[in-house]
């Protein structure tokens, strides 16, 4: 039903996502309602489809953002720390920050310096206080390595498909924490995986099939056709 969720405004888009049962969390709904996708996607921001933002990067479709926030809702709580790998436009980073509140921190890590600059510009349009308070921190770096300086994280979101689950990211997951990551399987298909750390052990669960751009090095992304 996600493909029927497009709207003419941000509010209509998010209402359609909920009406089509793409997500159930009231907190995720409130977060997405409060962050206008139009600030982050230059073309057709309220269409339920991925949008190109330059530098061979995309902002994921709204239904995937809704699903990710839904799966992470019990870990994106007041005061929590979260990591958004491949933060791109900054959209989901801000949504996550809305859910962890004033005392929480969300680190967005992005390896394209132009997108780091773009995301901060996007955030300052209507959510500059998130940057000023330190609720949102945008870092230039290789997201596959996470950001150990602020670890451990209660929630980790990865916005591109990895060939396997990076150990650096599971190492930075807090006890009781959860990571949502698209993973490319040996047959080339991709699955959205829920990774939980319970009693120091990693538990993995496939929740749905997905299509994402690959999680690569900066050089590979530059050269991708």
Swiss-Prot record:
GO process annotations (BP): methylation; multicellular organismal response to stress; protein modification process; regulation of autophagy; response to starvation
Name listed for the protein in its UniProt record: Protein-L-isoaspartate O-methyltransferase
UniProt-listed Enzyme Commission number(s): 2.1.1.77
Subunit structure, as described in the record: Monomer.
Keyword Ubl conjugation: no
Biological role: Initiates the repair of damaged proteins by catalyzing methyl esterification of L-isoaspartyl and D-aspartyl residues produced by spontaneous isomerization and racemization of L-aspartyl and L-asparaginyl residues in aging peptides and proteins.
Main enzyme class: transferase
Coiled-coil segments on the chain, per record: none
Species this chain originates from: Caenorhabditis elegans
Any one GO molecular-function label of the UniProt entry: protein-L-isoaspartate (D-aspartate) O-methyltransferase activity
